[in-house]
Regions:
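PRPP-dependent phosphoribosyltransferase catalytic core
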Residues: 249-287
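Core catalytic lobe of class I
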Residues: 2-249, 283-287
Length: 287
């Protein structure tokens, strides 16, 4: 790796502080089993003082196509790629990659409402995900590891009389392409100070399904490093990239790689409601 790129590692993987395009270029081709990409969406979000907004849509898409090409180079011939972006830009992603890889699923991550919703049109309640593979005849998909309850609407077990002898219908199934996972909220244990943090449960499904223990999982826009965290918990190896120093520090702490950075002790931010509870306990502690 280039010496100008800041990196930290442990026995499970490595995270890099710097520009994703530059760092991706230095990762060996066909060396990664699974890539999950959750890039800036070009919708004006504030990421630690850095605005998620390009001058034009064309500039944003041209930038996206660069890292998509690099990711396609880095993933193994039997590897998988999951791509996220906003609803308005996903059609461009879909058209761009469909003649380069096989799109197996167009996933809808559906979530509950929070805050103020649109009043003059139908507000967006989902984020799209493309599940792509290089070789549709040779890729990892561990269906048994991601089974969910097969809801029949019946209180009694349904019997399949087509079989001899008749047998109960299976109570579990592989999830469809509509995924219901709650967004990460402030009071959740997993919450970190980031405007678009993805839930652990979402990444668990992806990592379990499309990689095996010991495989390499890459996230070029790591944010709070949830992908790397899940990969480590599931005995995969990880590569994380993040350009924002504030979020890079979250990765160092969350992955147990470092407890200090540039002389600063890395600790979880105490939430306002936790401070209030602590003060109340102190107030009523007469012992």
């Amino acid at each position: 790796m280039n010496n100008t790129i800041e990196s930290y590692s442990n026995e499970n993987g490595c995270i890099y502080h710097g520009d994703a395009l530059e760092i991706l270029k230095q990762i060996p081709n066909e060396s990664v089993d699974l890539i999950f990409v959750d890039p800036p969406y070009n919708i004006g979000k504030n990421f630690a003082g850095r605005k998620d907004k390009w001058k034009t849509d064309k500039e944003y898409l041209d930038w996206c196509y660069q890292w998509i090409e690099l990711c396609l180079q880095k993933v193994k011939p039997n590897g998988s790629l999951y791509l996220m972006t906003s609803t308005q830009f996903m059609p461009y992603f879909d058209l761009y990659v469909r003649d380069k890889v096989t799109i197996l699923s167009r996933i809808v991550w559906s979530y509950d409402s929070s805050g103020v919703q649109a009043k003059n049109y139908y507000g967006s309640m989902y984020e799209p995900i493309l599940f792509c593979v290089k070789d549709k005849n040779n890729y990892t998909f561990n269906s048994e590891d991601i089974l969910v309850e097969a809801k029949t609407g019946s209180k009694r077990k349904l019997i399949d009389y087509r079989k001899n002898p008749p047998q109960p219908y299976k109570t579990e199934k592989v999830p469809g392409n509509v995924w219901d996972f709650a967004r990460v909220r402030y009071r959740m244990e997993e919450y970190e100070n980031h405007p678009t943090q993805k839930p652990i449960s979402l990444l668990e499904r992806i990592v379990k399904a499309s990689s095996n223990p010991g495989d390499v999982v890459l996230d070029p826009f790591s944010g709070t490093f949830t992908t790397c965290y899940v990969a480590q918990q599931l005995n995969r190896r990880f590569i994380g990239i993040e350009i924002q120093e504030e979020y890079f520090k979250i990765g160092l702490r969350r992955l147990g790689i470092a407890s200090e950075y540039k002389g600063e002790k890395l600790e979880r931010e105490i939430k306002s409601y936790q401070t209030k509870i602590s003060k109340e306990r102190t107030l009523f502690n007469f012992g």
